[in-house]
């Protein structure tokens, strides 16, 4: 694969102003500032454990709440992943990982199929982690899936601490994405589909 697998997305609305840069073949370097500290912490997990170089800057109406910024970061990051993958030639396509964090264990399975779908099964008992509304975890992944064109299954195997569960989820997600987006040298420039194409629906 000769071309660089990286992309930049800028997205501005009346509610948020977001820029995202990603290098899929990076080393886990990140500069992230969304104005939402817990989301920043989770995005650093994606970069660190996925070995993606990631730069995210977001300015949003967090004086109202975090919903718009959280969702729009998911949108922009999903678009950045999709753009960096291009035609998805040579990728492994499928990824899965179990990540533990103390008592929590979360499984993530995904397919860079071009077919957006989310199955989400986290039981988060705490309404907030710090100041972060735990309902926003699902909203982030919905936004990401719809704009990256992946099929994503998130399953909580066990766990009681909401912070541990969410962090295990993001770590498993990052490793599964790393697995799915890595180049399979046996595929060369071929698209990993019997249809001969993978496109976001």
Curated annotation (Swiss-Prot):
GO terms for biological process: L-histidine biosynthetic process. Its main location: cytoplasm. InterPro entries: IGPD_sf (IPR038494), ImidazoleglycerolP_deHydtase (IPR000807), ImidazoleglycerP_deHydtase_CS (IPR020565), Ribosomal_Su5_D2-typ_SF (IPR020568). Keywords: Amino-acid biosynthesis, Cytoplasm, Histidine biosynthesis, Lyase. It is an enzyme of class 4 (lyase). Pfam families: IGPD (PF00475). NCBIfam families: PRK00951.1-1, PRK00951.1-3, PRK00951.1-5, PRK00951.2-1, PRK00951.2-4. HAMAP family: HisB. This is Imidazoleglycerol-phosphate dehydratase. The gene is hisB.
């Amino acid at each position: 694969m000769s071309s660089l697998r990286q992309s930049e997305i800028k997205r501005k609305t009346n509610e948020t102003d977001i820029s995202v840069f990603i290098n899929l073949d990076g080393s886990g370097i990140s500069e992230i500032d969304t104005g939402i500290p817990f989301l920043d912490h989770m995005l650093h997990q994606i970069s660190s454990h996925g070995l993606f170089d990631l730069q995210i800057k977001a300015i949003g109406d967090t004086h109202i709440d975090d919903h718009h910024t959280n969702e729009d970061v998911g949108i922009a990051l999903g678009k950045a992943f999709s753009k960096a993958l291009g035609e998805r030639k040579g990728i492994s396509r499928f990824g899965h990982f179990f990540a533990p964090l103390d008592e929590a264990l979360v499984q993530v399975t995904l397919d860079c199929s071009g077919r957006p779908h989310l199955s989400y099964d986290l039981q988060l008992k705490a309404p907030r982690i710090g100041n972060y509304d735990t309902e926003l975890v699902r909203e982030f992944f919905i936004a990401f899936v719809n704009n990256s064109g992946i099929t994503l299954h998130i399953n909580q195997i066990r766990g009681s601490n909401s912070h541990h569960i969410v962090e295990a989820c993001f770590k498993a997600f990052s490793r599964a994405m790393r697995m799915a987006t890595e180049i399979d040298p046996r595929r060369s420039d071929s698209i990993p589909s019997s249809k001969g194409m993978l496109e976001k629906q």
